[in-house]
């Protein structure tokens, strides 16, 4: 396995992974989003590419700037293919995201995880993260 930055050719695999986590997306929409991320580099998207060149996971990290805290990083997504979990892929992707954050002078990493994803919570705790708070999330379309 190797961890590398994602590119638009990974869109189909990234859409598949996103769907596994309950966020269905088309390859076209995923490719468009990835091109936007690459064009506006406030973060990075990594993939775990297996020896057979299949994509087994992805991580998306962003820089966060706030008046309330020092600059930090936000792990916007971490997905490992259901058939490949518990093989160290998530840990490797998380390390890549943390390395990106450190290289960009960021001193902390924030992760949100749905309250029903208890397996993910155990993973983050094992990786040294601590639960900070639980909160409601609000959304409003702007179009």
Kindly give the residue locations of the regions a language model identified:
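Conserved GNAT acetyl-CoA-binding A-motif
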Residues: 94, 101-113
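Conserved acetyl-CoA-binding loop of GNAT-fold acetyltransferases
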Residues: 125-134
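Conserved acetyl-CoA-binding loop-helix of GNAT-fold acetyltransferases
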Residues: 80, 86-99, 122, 126
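Conserved beta-strand-loop-alpha-helix junction that forms the acyl-donor binding cleft
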Residues: 111-120, 139-142
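Acetyl-CoA-dependent GNAT
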Residues: 5-71, 76, 94-95, 132
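Extreme N-terminal starter segment of soluble prokaryotic enzymes
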Residues: 1-2
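Hydrophobic adenine-recognition pocket in adenosine-nucleotide-binding enzymes
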Residues: 6, 78-80, 113
